[in-house]
Structures are given as C-alpha cells and as structure tokens.
Amino acid sequence: MLSLIIRRSRSRFIIHGIKISCNSLSAVDSSSSVLVSRRTFSSTPALSYFGFNYGKISNLNQRFGNYAYSGSSFASSTRSLSSEAVAVAATCDGLTVERIIANQWPILDENEGDWKSHAAAIAQSIQVIKRRLQWKKLLVRLKVLSAELNKSDLWDDPTHAGKISREHGSLTGKMKGVMTFERELLEHIDMLKLAKEENDSELESETLKALIDMRRVSKEKELEALLSADNDPCSCYIEVQAGAGGTESNDWAAMVMEMYKTWAQRRKFSVTVVDEAPGEIAGIKRATIKVNGEYAYGYAKAEVGVHRLVRISPFDSGKRRHTSFAAVAVIPILGDGSTRVEINDSDLRIERFRSGGAGGQHANTTDSAVRIVHIPTGITATCQNERSQHSNKASAMAVLQSRLDQLEMARQTAMNAQHTQSLTEISWGNQIRTYVLHPYRMVKDLRTNYEVSDPDSVLEGDLDGFILSFLSSSLDKDDPEH
C-alpha cells in the first residue's frame, strides 16, 4: 500500500518501469496534470499505473503508510526502523523539520497564525520530543536490542527473551510514532503548497485545519515524551496521609484525596478506593486509591511530597488562620511477572479486624478488614473497602507487593528516603506545594516556582500544569544538552 501526491514536474525518474515526477513523487499522465489525493493505493497490477487512483483529496487523516521520502528518494517499510529513523524526511522542495526551525518563522497564537506559524510550532514540538526521548541513544539501544533478538539462543532464557522483546516493542512504538508525526507535518506542507498552485481553496482550507489539529496534538505528544522511565506506563496507588493537627489536617487530607480522584477521572483513569481511615470528626487520617490507566504513575509521581494548606479554619469558631499538612505517596503497580521482591508466607503477619466507618444499618459487623505486616521490613498494607475478607486480603497483598517493589527500586537507586514508608516528618521543611486560600489566593509549586491564582480549579483536579512543569524541570536537570 502506498500513498502519493501525483502531479506534473520537470524532474523525472523511473520506479519499477513507471515514470514518476514531482518534487516529491508523481505519475505522468499524457493528457494533463493529475492531482492524486492522499488516498491509499493498491499495488494490484490490473489497475492503471499499478492501481494508482486519481481524484481530489478525500480524507486528510489518512497517511503515507511507512514511506519516508527526501528529494528524489524514499524508503519503504521493508527497511529496518533504525535505518528509517536516520533518514531525513523532507517535503518536495527539500524542507525538513530542522530547516523549518532554522527559518525562525514566527510562532503566533493558534487563531492568528498562518500555515508557517503552525508548521513552526509543530516542528519545535518535534524537536523537543526528540530531545526528551534522547533520540540518538534510542537508535543505539534499538540496534543492540535488534542484535539480541536475532540471536539463535535467545529463547533459551524465556524471561530474558520476553524482557528484550517488550523493550524492543516499546522503543519501536515510540520511534515510529515520532517519525509518522514528522512525515505527516511535511505531507501537510506539501499539500498546502500544491493547493495554492492549483488555486484549490477547498483543499487549502482542509489541509490548514488538519495542520491546526496537529498543532494541538503536538503539545500532548510533548507531555508524553516526558514519560520515558521504565515504570511510567504503569498504573499506581496514590496514598494520602494527614499531618499533625487533628481535624483540620484530616479535612485537608480528604480535600487532597478528592483532588486526585477528580484529576484521575478527568484523565479517563479508573479509580478504586483501597483503604480509608476516617477522621474522628471530619476528613480522613489516611487513604489509598488505585488508579488504573496508561501512564498513571508517570503523571502522578510528580505529586509525591508534602502539601501545605493556609486558610481560615471552618472548625475554628474564632475564624483564625490555620496551616495544615498532608503527605502524598505514589507507588507504581508493576505488570504481571515484573515484581522485584518475592514474598514468603512465613514473613507475613495477617491481622483481621472490623471495618471502620460512619456505621448505621450498612455497617460491616464482621471482621472483614485485613492488615498485612511484612515482618522483615515492617511495611504494612491495609484494606477494608471490600465486603469480604478474601477480597480485602487480595487487595492488601497487591498493595504490599507494590510497596516492597518500590522499596527495592529505591534501594537499588539509593533513594530510600523517597519511599512511602520512609516519608520524613510531615511539616514545614518537606513541602513541595503551598495552597493559600487566605489572605490571598494562590497555589505555588516550590520545586519549579510554577503558580496559579485560582486554587479552586486546582482543588477540582486541574493539575496538569504543575505536573508538566515538574516533569520538564526534572528532565532538564538530567539533560546535558539543555
């Protein structure tokens, strides 16, 4: 399958016996110049020009398949990905992403800019994405993995083979996505130039709209490129624990947990309450939720730390200003077969107790809640949200496994202090973000200095700005080219 722009041009060459001409690619028609849409062409010999179909553009969302072209050459999908990634994609007249950036076309607002402005914004995003993914290192790693996969004895060790295969597939997916996005930009530019030459206002309008849509998508792809660590694609547990301060801190902890539930739902993640210990008057002492979704951990890891609230207390009859703290921990849920720590039954102490809560006619009157203690480390996991003891035990074991895996990862990277069970004192010196509701209104991240003046939107789950700024700053610290 192949998609081509077919038009008249002075430079000609021959592919498989067919005369092709174009600054990109074109087929010669003896009677007139022919514009062929970005449709997908069949290679069935019975059709004229090996099945090349003619007509105006019908669907701008269809792509060029796996063909990358530069000047008078193109690479088919039969070439290796690494070779294709090294090749420089270009428009008919030799315009590349690098040249677009070098041209320094002004980047205006989406509603004000012309096609050059949109193209420059997208090209800039592609450059940022490649830098964040460390493109050259990916190419080297891909070659190493490809060599491993070609070894005849690879599957003598199925565990190792599976790991290599998964990593190769992950890298391939990332790189193909970027290359396809880059080619799509250049295709749109070719289409716009062609539409102008042919005075085709409809084609020009549709292509410009596609370019604007692509500009919006490019920002999402920039964010995705920040999530390149091994565990970033995982689902996760988010734990919130109230600091010292009684009812005031318990209420703040409940607000923080509700903020994460709303954030997760806005990102289309599924949320399940695993454990919750209610406060005596209001709020929660602690709570754990399970967030299921691709890259849930990659995003949520930016929230680890102590969150501070300054407000007029609704529980103080004197209407005085109070400061409250809540600690947040995020634990990745590794995929099946990826656990780092093997848990022996002899290392566990399992305690059963009656679930807490507000009571009433639906109060659980059986000892269905479960607390599991890992004796060697002292790490505990509790679940009381399920109705049966069996379900609570299974959920608690899953949480314990994830905590132990995280502890092992922290030990291996000399980062034990960041582990959820090693959280330092929940107080002034360890805060990452401050939420001020009085005497002024502001939320400020102390790590990146990113701030907003609308605390309500943040508490309603609008966290992406904080997450993006943290992930960007973390990457920039590790990036020698920055």
From Swiss-Prot:
Pfam families (UniProt xref): PCRF, RF-1
Any GO CC annotation of this UniProt entry: chloroplast stroma
Job of this protein: Directs the termination of translation in response to the peptide chain termination codon UGA. Required for the proper translation, stability and normal processing of UGA-containing polycistronic transcripts in chloroplasts.
Protein name, entry field: Peptide chain release factor PrfB2, chloroplastic
Single Gene Ontology MF annotation: translation release factor activity, codon specific
Transit peptide: 1-21
InterPro entries from the UniProt entry: PCRF (IPR005139), Pep_chain_release_fac_I (IPR000352), Pep_chain_release_fac_I_sf (IPR045853), PrfB (IPR004374)
Underlying gene: PRFB2
Subcellular location as annotated: Plastid, Chloroplast stroma
